Amino acid sequence: MSIGRRLTASFAGIALTALAACDGVTGVGSRVEPALIIFYRDSSTIVAPDTVSRGEAFTVRIKTFGGGCTREAVRADVAIAGTLAEIRPFNRTQNANACTADLLFLYHTVQVRFDVGGRTVLRVMGEQRGASTGGTNGPALVERAIVVR
């Protein structure tokens, strides 16, 4: 085997070892958690039209909080019953010994459709962190009313 092939094989072995040891790259050692929607004095924003048409889907965009070991928006579950749409966003958090000390906004986009008219509510359910919860998270919700014609 030539020196070039031995070096290539050695570098490939080192790269595979490093990749296998890095949880952040492979996704191993992570957990999916309810998104943080209230962070101290800041609340998530719910971006949606003020008025929508009955039976027509529309886009809802939710800003959640991340940073540190939480760096990815994973999914948002939607359940609609009458005039209420419950949206539960989830983010991925890496299990790590050390994380960055930053704050990120992670966005979730969903489609919602109401089949009834009148005043309806978009309810985002997730977690909160603040002075009242200390270093742990607690349940939270943020709502926005819209009109269906």
Question: What name fits each language-model region?
Answer:
Residues 16-41:
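Bacterial Sec-dependent N-terminal signal peptides
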Residues 47-52:
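Short beta-strand segments of immunoglobulin-like
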Residues 54-60:
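Structural beta-strand segments of beta-rich domains
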Residues 55, 116-121:
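Short tyrosine-centred short linear motifs in exposed loops/low-complexity segments
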